[in-house]
A protein has these predicted regions:
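Peripheral terminal and inter-domain segments
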Residues: 312, 321, 343, 383-535
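N-terminal secretory signal peptides and thylakoid transit peptides that target proteins
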Residues: 1-17
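Boundary at the C-terminal end of the N-terminal hydrophobic targeting segment
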Residues: 23-28
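Short, conserved catalytic-motif segment at the N-terminal edge
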Residues: 31-90, 110-114, 119-120, 125-127, ...
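Short, well-ordered beta-strand elements
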Residues: 347, 358-361, 365-374, 512-513
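Short, surface-exposed loop or secondary-structure junction motifs
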Residues: 75-76, 129-353
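Short loop/turn microsegments at loop-to-beta-strand junctions
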Residues: 53-55, 333, 356-358, 499
């Protein structure tokens, strides 16, 4: 946990650096060279990892878009190529749009960054009344609330029926697992609350503001703020390796497209094309002003959004496998900030089922790169997210492809070992302590809602089924595993399975806890945060 004093020290250090750090160094103008280098590198990456279905890549150099291109196919085995107009889900890269929207409202005098959230959302409540009172609009964006990693994400993922109001109402039941403003833990639910602040101030939903005040002025005509608005636009299909034995291993598989992420739009709803996202990068690098002179926000707001707020990580610096590893990393307002080979880089990643994306901006060069993929291929993503900025700097001296292959091989070996360990019953696969019918019933968690366990079949064919009442995708068989621990087998095999550990007292089931089966499960499957009580 990072103490408040250390955070204050970090902000003080950045304040001392001040404008000098944001002033542009004198780099030689070489517009076009980085775009060509990234294009060549992307082709090398695609050749090195032939299972990667497709990519969309955009490069801005000295304020000009020099590359906006698609690579590969929209669907593995299909004929449709990825082009500069193909839409990808950019997930948490959306957070910078939400921060920019709030910055615009700050400039209009409709709110202040350090106003309490309750001023605009009177019903806003965290589980700690002190945190409720102190939580500001700025805090909503900084991942320093004290919530644990991904807390409450089952209210937004995968495709549940919770409304935005449900999500905000559920916050008061999420335990504060850390120190308020004293540490970093990434969340999504507070960005949903930030979107509701925008709606409360403007009288229109978050997506309407984003469309009218950002996408339309930038002429981002391909892009949509919510997946449900894609319609018949060309889009990439999501892919992942679904095992065996666990997700992340096995052959590449096409996943069903999730178009129902609307409730969490402010946290990750945007779908964008390579040619559109370059316009967003330009206005960011222009500190609120486009190359054509259209001003969306002031330079002061642009700098405010890039100002470090929360320490997120620190290390001993570069390693043999990662020569760009930063010694210190921070979160700003919708962006991460650290250095890349001695230059400030402002960046973010995004992940949805079957999609990974990355935005990296080098303000000193007024240059940046956006990488959008339609698969969960970590070595492809790692090669491009680090090798891309290298090429913006005119470098190609490190073999990111070889390094990423090595890191991936080591990761897969560990994953196989960890998965085998997770799937080995500690009690030797003992039978349940009670008849299966005793586990049936409705279980309720205060922030998520109800989970139903039911009996199917009769006699020797009796089995259990499980259904998350507000998440249609999370339903299927509940198989015996080890005593009172069962394992889900969801009908939708693109979902992460979970262990369900029932609590038994005096011969009766009283409740249950859960945890993901795969060691590589996305943190948004926050089963471990559920405290299910049988009702």
């Amino acid at each position: 946990m990072i103490a408040t004093t250390r955070r204050a020290a970090l902000l003080s250090a950045f304040a001392t650096i001040g404008a000098a750090a944001l002033a542009r160094p004198a780099f030689a103008r070489q517009t076009g060279k980085a775009g060509a280098a990234v294009d060549q590198f992307a082709q090398e990456v695609m050749a090195a990892f032939p299972d990667e279905p497709g990519l969309g890549i955009t490069v801005v150099e000295d304020g000009e878009i020099t590359l906006a291109k698609g690579y590969g196919v929209r669907r593995l085995g299909g004929p449709d190529r990825v082009t500069d107009s193909t839409l990808f889900g950019v997930a948490s890269n959306t957070k910078a749009f939400t921060a920019a929207a709030l910055a615009m409202l700050v400039e209009e005098g409709k709110l202040a960054w350090d106003d309490p959230v309750t001023k605009y959302l009177p019903a806003f409540e965290m589980s700690d009344p002190i945190v409720t009172r102190l939580m500001t609009v700025r805090d909503l964006l900084c991942h320093r609330s004290g919530l644990t990693l991904g807390a409450g994400d089952l209210m937004i993922w995968p495709n549940p029926t919770h409304t935005r109001a449900d999500i905000v109402a559920g916050l008061k039941y999420l335990p504060i697992g850390g120190q308020f403003r004293g540490g970093y833990a990434y969340d999504n639910v507070l960005y949903v609350a930030a979107g509701e602040v925008i709606a409360a101030l403007t009288g229109a939903p978050w997506e309407v503001f984003i469309q009218k005040r950002i996408l339309d002025p930038l002429k981002m005509t391909d892009s949509v703020p919510l997946p449900s608005l894609i319609g018949n636009r060309p889009r990439a299909e999501p892919h992942a390796r679904m095992g065996p034995p666990v997700r992340g291993l096995g052959p590449q598989t096409v996943l069903p497209f999730d178009g129902s992420f609307d409730s969490a739009g402010a946290a990750g709803g945007l779908n964008a094309s390579p040619r559109d996202i370059g316009k967003w990068m330009q206005v960011q690098l222009g500190l609120g002003t486009t190359p054509g002179g259209v001003k969306l926000w002031t330079e002061a707001s642009g700098r405010e959004m890039w100002k470090p707020q929360t320490i997120t990580a620190w290390s001993d610096g570069p390693t043999a496998d990662n020569p760009v590893r930063a010694s210190l990393q921070a979160y700003a307002l919708g962006w991460f900030v650290n250095d890349h080979r001695g230059e400030k880089i402002v960046w973010h990643t995004g992940g949805l089922a079957g999609f990974i994306s990355y935005t990296g901006l080098l303000p000193g060069r007024k240059s940046g790169i956006m990488v959008m993929t339609n698969a969960e291929e970590t070595p492809v993503f790692r090669s491009l997210r680090y090798g891309g900025p290298d090429r913006l700097q005119g470098r190609s001296d490190f073999d990111w492809i070889a390094s990423s292959k090595k890191v991936q091989a080591e990761s897969e070996a560990k994953l196989v070992k960890d998965a085998a360990e997770a799937m080995t019953p500690k009690g030797g696969g003992a039978p349940p302590t009670l008849p299966l019918a005793a586990y049936a019933g409705t279980y309720r968690d205060p922030w998520y809602g109800a989970v139903t366990v039911s009996v199917a079949g009769k006699g020797k064919k009796t089995s259990l089924k499980i259904a998350f009442d507000k998440t249609p995708a999370l339903k299927g068989a509940l198989e015996t595993f080890d005593g009172d621990t069962f394992k889900t087998r969801f009908d939708d095999r693109s979902q992460e399975d979970a262990f369900v550990v029932f609590s038994v007292k005096d011969g009766a089931v009283t409740g249950a806890t859960m945890r993901a089966v795969s060691p590589l499960a996305d943190f948004s499957y926050d089963y471990q945060d559920l405290k299910l009580v049988k009702i």
